[in-house]
Amino acid sequence: MWEPYMPVEPGLGREENFLSLEDLLMSQEKLPCCIESGFPRLGFLDKGGDSDSIPEGSKMELPLWLAKGLYDNKRRVLSVELPKIYREGWRTVFSADANVVDLHKMGPHYYGFGSQLLNFDSPENPEIAKTILQTFVGRFRRIMDSSQNAYNEDTSGLVARLDELERSLFRAGQRGLNAFQSWERGKAAQITASNLVQNYKKRKFNEADA
């Protein structure tokens, strides 16, 4: 099938891939911040203010890419407040049963955005990282089982609740199932490795060369 652009995989962990459309969209998501040092002549960033500067102590939401660019742990230019889905209350919900949460409604880039939060110095970072990993592990099996066992069924209800990373995994699982079904019917000459496996091998090869 023809695609309007060549898909590029999102970055891994705290690294972003600015050739990835998904990472670009994620970097536009807003992050609640508190200004620790006044910003002269940047009042236009605060749509609710009427000053040409942003005074110290102001609270505002900044795009992730801008918050990362301004953040400096030594100078304390700004501090970051955790979005509610990454706070302790929601971490408790995820640890109880991550499958009940509508991740797309809470944050379409839950895993990627949460990984980016680790760039900011927070005492809760270890717990955030732990919850993100446990959530992924807890939901992964159900997602892949559904992608393999819902052949020709309506999966829109399930997919609507998935984070963007989970949606890509679900689609990869269905593509693999379709390829296997075609192979069984003799419509494919051979089974090839999935794009995820091929990209992983390329990354490992490049790391070995480096």
Curated annotation (Swiss-Prot):
InterPro entries: GINS_A (IPR021151), GINS_bundle-like_dom_sf (IPR036224), GINS_Psf3 (IPR010492), GINS_Psf3_sf (IPR038437), PSF3_N (IPR055221). GO terms for biological process: DNA replication; mitotic DNA replication initiation. GO terms for molecular function: chromatin binding. Pfam families: PSF3_N (PF22466), Sld5 (PF05916). The keyword Nucleus applies. The keyword Nucleus applies. GO terms for cellular component: CMG complex; GINS complex. It is found in: Nucleus; Chromosome. Gene3D superfamilies: 1.20.58.2050. Keywords: Chromosome, DNA replication, Nucleus. Component of the GINS complex which is a heterotetramer of gins1/psf1, gins2/psf2, gins3/psf3 and gins4/sld5. Component of the CMG helicase complex, composed of the mcm2-7 complex, the GINS complex and cdc45. Required for correct functioning of the GINS complex, a complex that plays an essential role in the initiation of DNA replication, and progression of DNA replication forks. GINS complex is a core component of CDC45-MCM-GINS (CMG) helicase, the molecular machine that unwinds template DNA during replication, and around which the replisome is built. Belongs to the GINS3/PSF3 family. This is DNA replication complex GINS protein PSF3. It comes from Xenopus laevis (African clawed frog). The lineage of its organism: Eukaryota, Metazoa, Chordata, Craniata, Vertebrata.
